């Protein structure tokens, strides 16, 4: 009998097994989904694949900064549900992973997972995460991180219990006044989500593309060619004010820009990282489609 994609999708949803494994299981059980579930369990495929194959798009973003504010890390660790993200054991794992990263020389997630765990020389980081998966009962994934070292000082901010995290590298004197300014800047980044620090960080290719788009818009609107250049210039200024942190109106006082606020307080921003929980993670529907296409392309 023919095996439908609908049945494969349902079996995959129930077991977490791959497309080809689900197709084979349905073929072996004449399309009986319940029997196919048992088949996969007997083969050990369902039990092994279910947790590791599920999409982990919840979790937490965490920021960890050394006492002297010279070193810091921002990290995203994913779980499957918001419920587990609020679990004390999960929170403890995220904090410990952050502490490990503060001591790590790794520059990628793959490198980190192979490292010896900072609290147990007989285990690697991957083993610690697998133990947490077994204990908590959900797939857990160390997704990404960024490490900072500075001659200035670092400022972090966590929004909504770990839904958004920001880490900012700042040059200047650290005191009560500049600490408040730095925190306000971090909160601004969390709220407004600038794509760049300054205009200098935008590639010439991107700038030229934006200019071309605006020029085409003006031509399509019938604007005289001799004034289009000036109009495009004005639109580019607006573009910079939307995507560049230093050009943006400060969220707490829109009469000044972030750049002016920094300058007035004798500070300089060297860089920043903003993580939003789950951004860019494909959900299950898209994941299934991608896997099907992958198998089709193997033919």
UniProtKB/Swiss-Prot annotation:
Residues 81-84 are annotated as: Involved in Mg(2+) ion dislocation from EF-Tu. Gene3D superfamilies: 1.10.286.20, DNA helicase RuvA subunit, C-terminal domain (1.10.8.10), Elongation factor Ts, dimerisation domain (3.30.479.20). Associates with the EF-Tu.GDP complex and induces the exchange of GDP to GTP. It remains bound to the aminoacyl-tRNA.EF-Tu.GTP complex up to the GTP hydrolysis stage on the ribosome. It is found in: Cytoplasm. This is Elongation factor Ts. The keyword Cytoplasm applies. Its main location: cytoplasm. Pfam families: EF_TS. Belongs to the EF-Ts family. One of its GO terms (molecular function) is translation elongation factor activity. The gene is tsf. GO terms for cellular component: cytoplasm. The keyword Metal-binding does not apply. InterPro entries: EF-Ts_dimer_sf, Transl_elong_EFTs/EF1B, Transl_elong_EFTs/EF1B_dimer, Transl_elong_Ts_CS, UBA-like_sf. Keywords: Cytoplasm, Elongation factor, Protein biosynthesis.
């Amino acid at each position: 009998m023919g095996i439908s994609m609908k049945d494969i999708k349902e079996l995959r949803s129930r077991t977490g097994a791959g497309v080809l494994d689900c197709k084979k299981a349905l073929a072996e059980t004449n399309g009986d989904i319940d029997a196919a579930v048992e088949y996969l369990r007997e083969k050990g495929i369902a039990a092994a694949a279910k947790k590791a194959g599920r999409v982990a798009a919840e979790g937490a973003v965490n920021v960890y900064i050394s006492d002297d504010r010279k070193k810091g890390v921002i990290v995203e660790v994913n779980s499957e549900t918001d419920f587990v993200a609020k679990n004390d054991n999960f929170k403890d794992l995220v904090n410990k992973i952050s502490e490990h990263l503060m001591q790590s020389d790794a520059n990628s997630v793959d490198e980190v997972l192979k490292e010896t765990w900072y609290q147990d020389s007989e285990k690697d980081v991957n083993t610690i995460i697998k133990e947490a998966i077994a204990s908590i009962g959900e797939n857990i994934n160390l997704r990404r991180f960024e490490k900072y070292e500075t001659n200035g000082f670092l400022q972090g901010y966590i929004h909504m219990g770990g839904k958004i995290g920001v880490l900012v590298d700042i040059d200047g004197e650290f005191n009560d006044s500049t600490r408040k300014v730095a925190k306000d800047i971090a909160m601004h980044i969390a709220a407004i989500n600038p794509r760049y620090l300054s205009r200098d960080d935008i590639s010439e290719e991107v700038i030229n593309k934006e200019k071309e788009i605006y020029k085409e818009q003006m031509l399509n609107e019938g604007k005289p060619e001799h004034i289009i250049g000036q109009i495009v210039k004005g639109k580019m200024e607006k573009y910079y004010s939307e995507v560049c942190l230093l050009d943006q109106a400060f969220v707490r006082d829109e009469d000044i820009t972030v750049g002016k606020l920094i300058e007035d307080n004798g500070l300089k921003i060297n860089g920043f990282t903003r993580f939003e929980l789950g951004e860019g993670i494909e959900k299950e529907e898209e994941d299934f489609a991608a896997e099907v296409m992958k198998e089709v392309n193997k033919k």
